[in-house]
Amino acid sequence: MQVDFYHLTRQPLTRVLPRLAERVVADGHRLLIVSDSADQRAALDRLLWDYAAESFLPHAEAGAMDDAAQPVLIAAAPDPLNGARYVLIADGVWRDEALGFERAFHLFDESAIAAARTAWKALADRAGVERRYWKQGEKGWEQAG
């Protein structure tokens, strides 16, 4: 299982999340986006409808329509009702339930850096967990750990 820590320093979540979601779906995977905040989930739902004029990313909020049919599902908890094997943590709060997925994307900004460091360290000795740390550089994302 792979955990990718994305430290948002140059671009906000609203710019990074849609591109990651597009890439996951283009690669033939399903994605579960997790946030504890109902306001953030609603904002992400709106964002994925209109973040780029040329893009269309089918998705829904959990419970809004047929969850199992959604390539991208936005939910409060890491329960893959859409059969997702990839999870994206959008609220910056690490959840160990993400370890039940094939791959986890943990996005966080400066306000959540201490918690992200704690999660990074806690996962260091977990068997079967490969950690990657990504930071935003001048030329885009750079793997730093």
Model-derived regions, located:
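Conserved active-site loop/cleft motifs that coordinate metal ions or position small ligands
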Residues: R132-W134
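Residue-level detector of anion-binding/catalytic polar loops
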Residues: R30, V129-E130
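Positively charged, polar, low-complexity stretches
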Residues: Q2-L99, L107-A112, R117, Q136-G145
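Conserved functional acidic sites
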Residues: R126
